[in-house]
Amino acid sequence: MNGPRDFDRRTALKFLAGGIALPLAGCGKPAEEIVPYVDMPEGLLPGEPMKFATTLALGGYGRGALVSTIDGRPIKVEGNPRHPASLGATDVFAEADILSLYDPDRSQAPRHRDDVATWDAFALALRGEMQRATARQGAGLALLTERVTSPTLRRQIGDLLKQYPQARWYVHEPVSDDFAVRGSTMAFGRPLSALPRIADAALIVAIDADFLGAGPRQIADARAFAQRRQRAVAPFLRLYAVEPDWSLTGANADHRLALHPGLLRNLALAIAAHLQGESPPDLPEGAAQLAKAAAADLEANHGRAIVMVGERQPPELHALAHWL
């Protein structure tokens, strides 16, 4: 047997390298067979895009869309040409719906107060609360949702409220048409949503109403407005826009007036006064002239005119627009 002096540096490095390589060889992942589906849906080809017709909600309204998916993952959204709210086109909100699915900051778990919780903890806490709510017939139980457009979800919420008759359901939308609905209730005695027929109009008076801008009906209203302008049918569609700041509607208006928000109500009252043959309220000279001209056009185009009021205006102004 060789002595210690025969154990040179090169041999020592060989033994050290072998000792390091052996544990590293066992760190690899075990061989696994990866398959896209255990039971593949009928008619689906892996890696091939498939389109589905669906509905995207915005502000309580549904917009028809066609969504392309690959292996069940949405990758592209298009407008549904058969749906009156999209007509084959999309807006920025529809495109953002796809991006939101892959947002790294999207919530992945429920929260309890300021801490991240788990779904198991949520289910356990909910089970206890529902048991206590049953004894009180739902008193103290509140459900907060956005505006629901799904018939299935509305039916499920209805079943929940039947089971807990003392529970309360609250609906909140950051941007909604609540003022417009309340205005229609004041004017007609019941809540209604106005759907203007722009394609048949000869005159539009928009008071802080950007119907060509972002909103649930942007695509349909913009398409109808463009088609009406392109039709060589007398009388030519005329658009008045009165607004406190710039908008797409104001940029396309024949007559645009920048007016302080506090004077919009007086302008609508001035139009109504001219139609009634009464003295209008005080307004700046430019606003007074526009109110007089708009009233004359409304009278000349009776039955073919539309008066729109923006969603952020009070219900009283919406009710006055219905009267006009």
PLM regions and their residue ranges:
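N-terminal export/assembly segments and adjacent metallocofactor-ligating motifs
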Residues: 1-280, 285-286, 292
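Residues that mark the start of a beta-strand
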Residues: 140, 303-304
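Acidic catalytic cores of enzymes that act on phosphate-bearing nucleotides/polynucleotides
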Residues: 304, 309-323
